[in-house]
């Protein structure tokens, strides 16, 4: 992960409109995974503000990777507010290290992950959204994936915290016909349509029914065998149905 320092200068820096416009701008960059920090902390500099952007590639932030919405907000900040942008490359993030974005893509998996919900199935490396064609119905962004990802993270958080809605949340995460899974499966279909790469939806699994029964379970949609021989609960996925485009894991709740 690369750190890029952005300095924004101008008389309108710090105004109400400035923070409104920059908020929309950075939200757009986050929605495409051009940056991975969902929150941004400003530091004062002469005649402006500075902040660090965390990017999958050195130039992830550039307009060539932006949606029309990201470009629009940047131009409004520059044009209406007369502000200047200065991007400076700082180096690799010591925590993340170098991000590997696979060029060869055997198949894709939709699953929430560290910075992008699209995972290459063989290498298990994540692919920023801006690396694939737009998936939203307006043909200009990835809002469909963003909305699903937001829902998934909130449901997952509800399950993880327990007590309040835990069973409902677990069913949403692990059942293929839940509202959450249906939303994600629709995203998978669209991703496969625009990329022409098989795209699978990841089904969470935390069933407490023992390893033997867990390994015997069939694809929940078609009922066919889908266990990958030799899989363990340490594997990222242990079940794969090519017909239904579903992938799942062995339960660690043994």
Language-model region placement:
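Domain-scale terminal segments
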Residues: 1-170, 197
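Surface-exposed cleft-lining segments at the edges of enzyme active sites
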Residues: 170-176
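Cys/His-clustered metal-coordination modules, chiefly Zn-binding fingers
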Residues: 178-254
């Amino acid at each position: 992960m690369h750190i890029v320092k952005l300095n924004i200068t101008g008389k309108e820096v710090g105004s109400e409109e400035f923070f409104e416009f920059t908020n929309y701008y950075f939200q757009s960059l986050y929605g495409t995974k051009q940056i991975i920090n969902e929150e941004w902390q400003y530091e004062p500099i002469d005649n402006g503000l500075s902040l660090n952007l965390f990017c999958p590639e050195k130039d992830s932030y550039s307009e060539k990777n932006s949606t029309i919405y990201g470009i629009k907000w940047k131009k409004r900040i520059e044009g209406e507010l007369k502000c200047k942008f200065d991007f400076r490359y700082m180096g690799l993030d010591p925590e993340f290290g170098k991000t590997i974005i696979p060029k060869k893509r055997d198949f894709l998996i939709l699953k929430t992950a560290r910075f992008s919900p699209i995972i290459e199935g063989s290498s298990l490396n994540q692919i920023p959204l801006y690396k694939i064609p737009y998936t939203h119905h307006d043909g200009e962004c990835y809002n469909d994936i963003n909305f699903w990802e937001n829902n998934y993270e909130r449901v997952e958080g509800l399950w993880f915290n327990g007590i309040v809605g835990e069973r409902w949340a677990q069913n949403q995460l692990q059942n293929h016909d839940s509202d959450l899974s249906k939303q994600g499966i629709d995203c998978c279909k669209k991703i496969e349509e625009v990329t022409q790469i098989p795209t699978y939806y990841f089904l969470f699994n935390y069933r407490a029914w023992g390893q033997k029964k867990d390994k015997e379970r069939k694809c929940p949609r078609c009922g066919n065998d889908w266990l990958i021989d030799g899989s363990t609960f340490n594997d990222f996925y242990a079940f794969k149905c090519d017909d239904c485009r579903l992938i799942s894991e062995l339960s660690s709740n043994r």
